[in-house]
């Protein structure tokens, strides 16, 4: 029986468990620094070095051993079970044969070839959290040199030694007692670790913060809700800005050439109730372009001004360089929760295009020439109003992808409407309590349906659609490959592969568990693997 080496860290009851007899090559690989060149590399191949694979957010792998002609022969290679998570939302990160995954507040290093545990950093889940934070969600890690970074449910940023899992430092970057939490994977840019928070439904004031990757010292913080006297503060009378929402609960993307970070923000607070926050409610439901060195705002674009429907704008901002309307452009593409796909010039935030991608859409008639929605009279009422898309949105945080060969964007859409209710008197903010001013109900007899959409940004419409069978409640995202395949978790617990050009189904594997995560791909010793989390397990697949 193998001996376990327990090493207690100085911050709370935390342990790193290292498995003796680890493969020497893995130890050597983990000791190698993740260099700036590694972080800048794109598209990913053997290494899937960050949540989205690379800075662009495109989730496109250059590996092509697995392709449309042989993907039907994929077999499960290994399954790793985590101990403390009911439903993983993590995307594994792989560097030189070592895989890093998270579950609640735990981090694991695995042999990416065999699934064998190399080390385990254990941390108890936090008590007393509310809303999203109380679900103890963790979506993954970031890498830099020989360090691993993760957020915890109570908004701490941890720095771990990649070789052992031992704690290097621990920084509390928000106060959980004031309703803050964290669910995201961090993003490393240069020598800074960028983090965001959850709690936008609970009356927190959102921000993006950057910490020194070496020391954990705060470098800068950008508040997404402006204080009195700052640009955009007119929406927030008195002290309402302190509880205005606009959280940053998914990682952003980064353009090294422009030196700009792109980060999405969530809905305003109180949720569904606009009388106490008249105006556009900046900078909620936005994509922000920030300077990674200073945190200075370069530009912003707001998708849903004065949001009454919980249409967060945190969906991944895809960075795509391609011809658009006769010119080569640096584009930012986002399929938004409000039901529209947007295309912006990411150099300056100029609005270029928007189109609906769901049929069930009644809150707006369209998008005007400046990118603002043309609103209808639909809004929450005391008696209830049918609103489309519903509370879960026409899409959500589940990852989109972009294939460089097909030039199509792939994402999961949801056809759904719900009944929204408002309260005659808005509630006041209180700590340790959700800050909702309404509720939503499903509409009896009106089912929801998930659909995988391939969107042609040049034509401005869907190239194909692949309807799902299931409840409509899954949160699985996509990944695409140079082999011409789109991988995704479907709404009926299966990991699927379809032809990226046509949507033709090619392969599926029933995991027997809900899939609430997005897939990735990596290579070890010349062999390509694809992996996805389902339930409490991580599955890895390869050709025979």
Predicted regions and their residues:
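Hydrophobic or amphipathic alpha-helical targeting/insertion segments
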Residues: 112, 117, 139-173, 178-224, ...
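Conserved blade-register residue in beta-propeller folds
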Residues: 109-111, 159, 210, 289, ...
């Amino acid at each position: 029986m193998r001996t376990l080496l327990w090493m207690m860290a100085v911050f709370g009851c935390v342990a790193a468990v290292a498995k003796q007899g680890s493969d020497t090559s893995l130890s050597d690989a983990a000791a190698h620094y993740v260099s700036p060149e590694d972080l800048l590399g794109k598209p990913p191949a053997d290494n899937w070095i960050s949540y989205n694979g690379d800075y662009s957010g495109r989730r496109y792998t250059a590996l092509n051993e697995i392709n449309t002609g042989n993907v039907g022969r994929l077999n499960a290679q290994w399954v790793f079970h985590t101990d403390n998570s009911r439903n993983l939302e993590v995307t594994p990160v792989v560097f030189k044969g070592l895989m890093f995954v998270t579950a609640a507040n735990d981090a694991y290093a695995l042999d990416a070839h065999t699934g064998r545990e190399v080390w385990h950093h254990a941390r108890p889940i936090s008590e007393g959290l509310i809303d999203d934070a109380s679900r103890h969600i963790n979506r993954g890690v970031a890498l830099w040199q020989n360090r691993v970074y993760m957020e915890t449910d109570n908004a701490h940023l941890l720095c771990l030694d990649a070789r052992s899992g031992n704690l290097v430092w621990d920084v509390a970057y928000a106060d959980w007692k004031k309703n803050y939490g964290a669910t995201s994977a961090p993003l490393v840019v240069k020598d800074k670790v960028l983090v965001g928070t959850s709690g936008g439904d609970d009356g927190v004031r959102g921000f993006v913060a950057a910490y020194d990757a070496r020391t954990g010292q705060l470098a800068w913080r950008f508040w997404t809700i402006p204080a009195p006297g700052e640009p955009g503060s007119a929406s927030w009378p008195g002290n309402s800005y302190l509880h205005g929402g606009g959280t940053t609960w998914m990682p952003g993307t980064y353009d090294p050439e422009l030196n700009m970070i792109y980060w999405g923000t969530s809905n305003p607070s109180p949720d569904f109730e606009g009388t106490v926050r008249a105006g556009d409610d900046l900078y909620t439901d936005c994509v922000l372009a920030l300077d990674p060195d200073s945190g200075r705002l370069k530009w912003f674009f707001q998708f849903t001004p004065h949001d009454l429907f919980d249409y967060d704008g945190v969906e991944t901002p895809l960075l795509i360089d391609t011809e658009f309307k006769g010119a080569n452009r640096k584009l930012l593409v986002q399929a938004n929760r409000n039901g529209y796909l947007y295309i912006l010039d990411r150099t300056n935030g100029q609005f270029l295009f928007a189109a609906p991608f769901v049929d069930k859409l009644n809150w707006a008639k369209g998008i005007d020439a400046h990118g603002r929605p043309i609103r209808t009279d639909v809004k929450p009422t005391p008696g209830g109003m049918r609103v489309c898309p519903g509370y879960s949105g026409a899409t959500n945080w589940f990852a989109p992808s972009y294939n460089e060969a097909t030039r199509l964007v792939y994402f999961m859409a949801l056809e759904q409407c719900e009944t929204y209710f408002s309260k005659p008197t808005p509630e006041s903010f209180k700590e340790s309590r959700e800050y909702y001013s309404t509720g939503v109900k499903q509409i009896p007899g009106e089912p929801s349906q998930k659909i995988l959409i391939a969107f042609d940004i040049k034509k401005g419409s869907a190239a194909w659609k692949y309807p799902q069978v299931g409840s409509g409640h899954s949160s699985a995202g996509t990944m695409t490959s140079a082999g011409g395949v789109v991988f995704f978790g479907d709404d009926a617990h299966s990991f699927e592969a379809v032809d990226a050009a046509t949507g033709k189904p090619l392969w599926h594997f029933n995991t027997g568990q809900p899939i609430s995560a997005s897939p990735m791909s990596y290579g070890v010793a010349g062999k390509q693997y694809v992996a996805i989390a389902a339930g409490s397990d991580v599955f890895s697949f390869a050709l025979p």
